[in-house]
Regions:
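Substrate-binding pocket helix/loop in short-chain dehydrogenase/reductase
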Residues: 82-83, 90-92, 180-181
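Short C-terminal tail/terminal secondary-structure segment
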Residues: 128, 200, 211-228
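Conserved glycine-rich cofactor-binding loop
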Residues: 10-11
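Active-site helix of classical SDR
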Residues: 106, 139, 147
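Alpha-helical segment proximal to the catalytic Tyr-Lys
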Residues: 111, 151-156, 208
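Residue(s) in the substrate-gating loop at a strand-loop-helix junction
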Residues: 123
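A conserved structural motif in NAD(P)-dependent oxidoreductases
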Residues: 184-195, 206
Length: 228
């Protein structure tokens, strides 16, 4: 069975990705928190903002696996506060988790990914944003750029793509309003499994022709004019 490593598996999109992939793949999960429901064959607890912990986890993965079929850089953190109230420590932590860790993991594990896949979970905030999300938006814009750069550096060996989700409702108790649904051409907000299905699709491209691309999965909200 092919092995796929997924970061950020404890909640939300990462949890859905791990659950979906566990149907076909051996899943290695990495997260700072212990998942309530583990859909992983192997789990490593790691704070991705801590470089020492990250390097130790990479060593453990290399000792366990001779090869990987996929690396899904999903883990991410988000803050939403006025620009004047943000601080450099928040910036550094968001960049560390959302951008530096995917770079380090991709660099370290790409030799194990011969004819495999790297899939980065970015965000539509790489293209459009709102006030108070500067660190997060910058990190996700960087992830899209990292994706196409890696696709060139690893050309012929590893396919590298990113997925940019829009509004994905990761709170099962939240019910979107009629207005919020109407913002989307799809008529609803996204669900974590919407992203998991795209990850599965990209992993099934065994010929590796799909590479260097970003897939916007937002129910059409970024294409629909919404007037206040």
């Amino acid at each position: 069975m092919k092995t796929v490593l997924v970061t950020g598996v404890a909640h939300g999109i990462g949890k859905a990705i791990a659950a979906k992939l566990s149907e076909k793949y051996c899943v290695i999960g990495v997260d700072k928190e212990l998942p309530e429901h583990i859909f992983c064959d192997t789990f490593y607890q790691c704070d991705l903002s801590n470089m020492q912990e990250l390097q130790e986890t990479i060593i453990q993965v290399k000792n366990r696996c001779e090869s990987l079929y996929g690396l899904v850089n999903n883990a991410g953190i988000f803050i939403h506060k006025p620009l004047k109230d943000q601080n450099i420590l928040e910036w550094e932590k968001i960049i560390a988790v959302n951008l530096t860790a995917p770079y380090v993991l991709s660099q370290a594990l790409s030799p194990l990914l011969h004819h495999g896949h790297i899939i980065n979970i970015a965000s539509t905030r790489a293209y459009m944003s709102e006030a108070g999300t500067e660190p997060y938006s910058a990190s996700k814009g960087g992830m899209v750029a990292l994706t196409h750069a890696l696709s060139i550096s690893l050309a012929g060996s590893v396919s590298v793509n990113s997925i940019s989700p829009g509004w994905i409702n990761t709170d099962e108790s939240y019910v979107a309003t009629v207005e919020e649904k109407a913002w989307h051409a799809s008529g609803r907000v996204g669900k974590p499994h919407d992203i998991a299905k795209v990850v599965e699709f990209l992993l099934e491209d065994e010929d590796g022709f799909i590479t260097g691309s970003d897939f916007v999965v937002d129910g059409g909200v970024s294409k629909k004019m919404v007037y206040p």
